[in-house]
């Protein structure tokens, strides 16, 4: 999917096409402005914006999500955590806008020193069956992808189609410029699952954002003690191809980055629901360790959906 934009709701009225065009223009302007300004000026502007949006409690859904992570009522989520979370989210977008013009070789050398668990990825590729890296929306996953391209070549991911098409294409062009192979979730020449299986059988790497799928295709899991749904794609790919399913986590360390690849999950049972639950458990441990860097501003749990939406999910 297009990282960070899943769940974007645009008005369904005659003006929606105008709104979508304006959204596209806004992202285009952001890309140009952030690249043109000095880093310190951009950082100060984004951090000021985060502090502004954190005033008066910050976004309600973000507060609800962090409350689950901390195990407290929403009102008890500390205001400094809300501010830090919004600053982290702003930093992600700031780096997205600047990443295409940064020195990727230099960045990769810097990241070589901080990425943990690379032996798990190396072992998966040495086995010749490919690797599925499954990540939550935390830290800067695009930065991790850039490193992966520099060290292991192109990997394959999937993007949800956005509207307008020009905005979707803008993000596709951005990620392809970093060396990613991006498959459309819908509307492609071949089903993405078929192509992903083919890549894995060729001992390639597949990367998927994997902690949220509030649709009928998602499988129900326990996440921080409450039911939600997560995508079955990572588990199904591992079962179908024999590829290693490697939970992966990204976070920020000061002005640097933290990345960790974890041991492969046991997929020998072929039980997609159980494997996805194991993935959810790993995600929960990592998000709890770095709550400010989990960029989830949309509903994550079934309890936060409307009754009509929950009824639709139950009617599958």
Curated annotation (Swiss-Prot):
Active site: 137, 211
Location (main, coarse): membrane
Pathway field: Phospholipid metabolism; phosphatidylinositol metabolism
GO molecular function, one term: acyltransferase activity
Subcellular location: Cell inner membrane
Documented EC number(s): 2.3.1.265
Chain's role: Catalyzes the transfer of a palmitoyl moiety from palmitoyl-CoA to the 6-position of the mannose ring linked to the 2-position of myo-inositol in phosphatidyl-myo-inositol monomannoside (PIM1) or dimannoside (PIM2).
Protein name: Phosphatidylinositol mannoside acyltransferase
Organism, scientific name: Mycobacterium tuberculosis (strain CDC 1551 / Oshkosh)
Gene this chain is encoded by: patA
């Amino acid at each position: 999917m297009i990282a960070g934009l899943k769940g974007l709701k645009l008005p369904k009225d005659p003006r929606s096409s105008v709104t979508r065009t304006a959204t596209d223009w806004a992202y285009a302007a952001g890309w140009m402005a952030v690249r043109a300004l000095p880093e310190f000026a951009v950082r100060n502007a984004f951090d000021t914006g985060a502090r502004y949006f954190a005033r008066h409690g910050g976004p309600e859904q973000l507060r609800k999500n962090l409350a689950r992570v901390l195990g407290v009522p929403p009102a008890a989520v500390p205001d400094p955590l809300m501010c830090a979370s919004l600053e982290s989210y702003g930093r992600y977008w700031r780096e997205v806008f600047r990443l295409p013009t940064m020195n990727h070789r230099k960045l990769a050398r810097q990241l070589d020193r901080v990425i943990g668990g690379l032996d798990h990825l190396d072992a998966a590729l040495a086995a010749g069956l490919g690797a599925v890296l499954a990540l939550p929306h935390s830290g800067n996953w695009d930065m991790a992808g850039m490193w992966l391209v520099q060290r292991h070549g192109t990997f394959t991911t999937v993007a949800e189609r956005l509207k307008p098409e020009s905005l979707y294409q803008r993000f596709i062009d951005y990620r392809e410029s970093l060396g990613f192979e991006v498959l459309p979730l819908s509307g492609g020449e071949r089903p993405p699952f078929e192509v992903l299986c083919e890549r894995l059988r060729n001992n390639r790497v597949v990367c998927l954002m994997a902690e949220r799928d509030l649709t009928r295709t998602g499988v129900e899991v326990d996440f921080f003690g409450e039911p939600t749904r997560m995508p079955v794609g990572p588990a199904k790919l591992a079962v179908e191809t024999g590829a290693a399913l490697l939970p992966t986590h990204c976070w920020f360390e000061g002005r640097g980055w933290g990345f960790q690849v974890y041991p492969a999950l046991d997929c020998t049972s072929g039980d997609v629901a159980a494997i996805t639950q194991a993935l959810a458990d790993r995600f929960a441990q990592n998000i709890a360790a770095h709550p400010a860097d989990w960029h989830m501003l949309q509903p994550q749990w079934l309890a936060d959906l409307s009754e009509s939406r929950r009824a639709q999910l139950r009617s599958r």
